[in-house]
């Protein structure tokens, strides 16, 4: 473990939670720098507690460190008090393992999980003393890269990154490290390195593409300016989930993380085709891990880390075709080891008594059902394929098994939504309350139904990308109306300020010009925009005005079905024709079957090189 400098010791003595910045946690990796050829700093643009909850970092950290001559370390966005001390004492941003500044690394990688973390990325580069824009960095600086779901529309942050990874990182990031290693040995300059990196499936080099605009501000084209790079960058995927063993060790945080438990990814992708859900489109095609590998990896992970809770992670865990087998495999050792099982992504339509029994042998965890919309009409519009009868059945099973609290997740501002749909949210919650009291229940034990309502944001690569977003004032009125429809003290309503959703929508569909706005807002004091106490909507409006851009143009304007978008040159697998088809079906409130029952011809199968499912069998 590296020594603490006198300046760092002073800073740590003056901040809350110094454990965020010390490293030395169980499970972290140390190597002899003399034997390391490639050093990578994995940077998460939020606090330690949030970043240490991110499964993607855990997967890639262990995967890269399996290579003897590569060393992956970690850095997080310092909290305000530590940021001030680092600036005062001139301590550059460093990695926790070696305490070396980011400028000592070959690769500095950021995870783009959420649009409102963009200014934190600039803050971290600034703290490290690294020029913000890629054009201002030559081969003497680390290669600045990014990955994550926000790369599906890379353009708002394109000016700040040398390369951006579209798709899944397990193989792509190893190929990047291998290419950087080769470039160091061969003495390539930056342009040579970027060109070689552009050959890797999923790697997007923004500087190799020029953007032109129409007089009305829409994108006219995004085309390569360098011979030999692809017209469209196609995302990288892991074809066989069993080809990469899940992490068998985690860095166990010194400061309590938001999600502090063992976690194994059981599948990737989703069969459901919800029209609002970006993740369900981005992570297609659907791929499963085998029950045996899941169980073996999970057992080793729990024993290595000491965790007594195991989460089975995915977009929809209950859609795994062999979920019962997975639970049987896990329960063969979990109860003996006093490890409880958690299924965070359950579909109410395949929730069963058997699942409850197999996941509550040690202790009960929370129960959340995503109804998404308050009426059947709107659930059909968004292709949720869930009925009230299924919601009632799921809650009935839960109450019969002793649950006395249920969380229901909804969205507000969905396309075609009316006030009747908003009232339906309150009505659904009241029906759940009434159901509880119509059943046998412990004497004196009441029920708590929590409604969590998010503001809908149209996202790229979804059928609703063509839709305009509800205005902030409209969302506020809908929130007030919902509260007026709730009359029971057994129902709790949670929602957040619509201003952050509006800004999220602007960045989600923004073009490359958005980088100037982000940089301007950062220089004017914007960072930690995901935290209510630091977010300033007015500051962002001032940044838009200073850059001569109108935020309304991006999120309050419907896209033409044939419009060139800022993400048209990035291929996530799902075709434009499929998105148009699903959008038109949504306007007619027509549903589409889950793709393991009937292929919807979305196009993602091309990434596998064949069909996603054997339709000669009944997959569900």
Which stretches of residues belong to each language-model region?
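A short beta-strand-loop structural module common to alpha/beta enzyme folds
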Residues: 69-81
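Conserved SAM/AdoMet-binding glycine-rich loop
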Residues: 42-43, 47, 107, 116, ...
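Canonical Radical SAM [4Fe-4S] cluster-binding loop centered on the CxxxCxxC motif
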Residues: 54, 256-292, 601-616
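Glycine-rich beta-alpha loop elements in corrinoid/cobalamin-binding modules
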Residues: 78-223, 460-511, 519-532
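Radical SAM enzyme core and accessory elements
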Residues: 1-29, 40-42, 487-620
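N-terminal pre-triad scaffold of radical SAM enzymes
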Residues: 40-46, 64, 251-276, 302, ...
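N-terminal [4Fe-4S]-dependent radical SAM core
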Residues: 9-41, 48-49, 206, 212, ...
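Short secondary-structure boundary/capping segments
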Residues: 57, 89, 125, 159-164, ...
């Amino acid at each position: 473990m590296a020594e603490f400098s006198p300046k760092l010791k002073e800073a740590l003595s003056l901040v809350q939670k110094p454990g965020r910045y010390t490293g030395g946690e169980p499970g972290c990796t140390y190597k002899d720098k003399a034997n390391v050829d490639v050093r990578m700093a994995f940077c998460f643009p939020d606090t330690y507690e949030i970043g240490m909850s991110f499964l993607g970092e855990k997967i890639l950290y262990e995967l890269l460190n399996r290579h003897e001559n590569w060393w992956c370390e970690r850095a997080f966005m310092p909290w305000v008090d530590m940021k001030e001390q680092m600036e005062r004492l001139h301590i550059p941003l460093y990695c926790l393992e070696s305490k070396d500044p980011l400028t000592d690394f070959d690769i500095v990688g950021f995870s783009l999980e959420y649009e409102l973390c963009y200014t934190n990325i600039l803050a971290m580069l600034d703290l490290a003393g690294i020029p913000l824009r890629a054009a201002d960095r030559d081969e003497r600086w680390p290669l600045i890269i990014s990955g994550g779901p926000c790369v599906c529309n890379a353009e708002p942050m394109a000016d700040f990154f040398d390369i951006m990874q579209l798709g899944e990182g397990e193989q792509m990031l190893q190929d990047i490290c291998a290419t950087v290693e080769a470039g160091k040995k061969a003495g390539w300059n930056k342009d040579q390195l970027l060109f070689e990196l552009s050959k890797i499936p999923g790697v997007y080099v923004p500087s190799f593409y020029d953007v032109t605009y129409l007089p009305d501000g829409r994108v006219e084209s995004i085309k390569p300016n360098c011979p030999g790079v692809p017209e469209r960058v196609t995302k990288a995927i892991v074809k066989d989930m069993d080809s990469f063993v899940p992490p068998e060790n985690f860095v166990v945080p010194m400061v309590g993380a938001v999600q502090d438990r063992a976690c194994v990814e059981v599948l990737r992708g989703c069969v459901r085709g919800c029209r609002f859900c970006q993740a369900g489109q981005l992570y297609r095609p659907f791929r499963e891990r085998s029950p045996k590998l899941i169980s073996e990896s999970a057992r080793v992970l729990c024993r290595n880390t000491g965790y007594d809770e195991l989460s089975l992670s995915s977009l929809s865990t209950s859609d795994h075709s062999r979920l019962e087998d997975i639970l049987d495999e896990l329960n063969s050792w979990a109860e003996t080891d006093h490890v409880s099982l958690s299924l965070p992504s359950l579909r109410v339509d395949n929730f069963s008594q058997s699942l409850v029994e197999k996941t509550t042998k040690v202790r009960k965890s929370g129960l959340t059902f995503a109804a998404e919309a308050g009426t059947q009409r709107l659930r059909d519009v968004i292709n949720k394929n869930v009925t009230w009868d299924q919601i009632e059945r799921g809650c009935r099973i839960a109450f019969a098994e002793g649950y006395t609290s249920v969380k229901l997740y909804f969205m507000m501002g969905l396309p075609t939504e009316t006030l009747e749909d908003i009232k339906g949210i309150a009505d659904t919650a009241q029906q759940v309350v009434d159901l509880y009291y119509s059943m046998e229940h412990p004497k004196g034990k009441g029920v708590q139904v929590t409604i969590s309502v998010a503001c809908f944001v149209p996202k790229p690569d979804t059928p609703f990308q063509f839709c305009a977003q509800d205005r902030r004032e409209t969302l506020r009125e809908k929130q007030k109306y919902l509260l007026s429809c709730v009359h029971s003290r057994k129902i709790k309503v949670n929602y957040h300020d619509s201003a952050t959703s509006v800004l999220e929508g602007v960045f989600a569909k923004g073009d490359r010009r958005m980088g100037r706005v982000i940089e301007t807002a950062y220089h004017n004091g914007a960072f930690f925009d995901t935290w209510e106490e630091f977010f300033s909507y007015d500051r962002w409006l001032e940044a838009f005005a200073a850059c001569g851009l109108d935020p309304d143009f991006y999120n309050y304007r419907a896209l033409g079905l044939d419009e060139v978008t800022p993400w048209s040159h990035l291929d996530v697998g799902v075709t434009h024709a499929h998105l148009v088809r699903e959008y038109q079906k949504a306007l007619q409130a027509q549903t589409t079957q889950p793709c393991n029952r009937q292929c919807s011809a979305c196009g993602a199968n091309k990434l596998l090189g064949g069909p996603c499912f054997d339709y000669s069998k009944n997959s569900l």
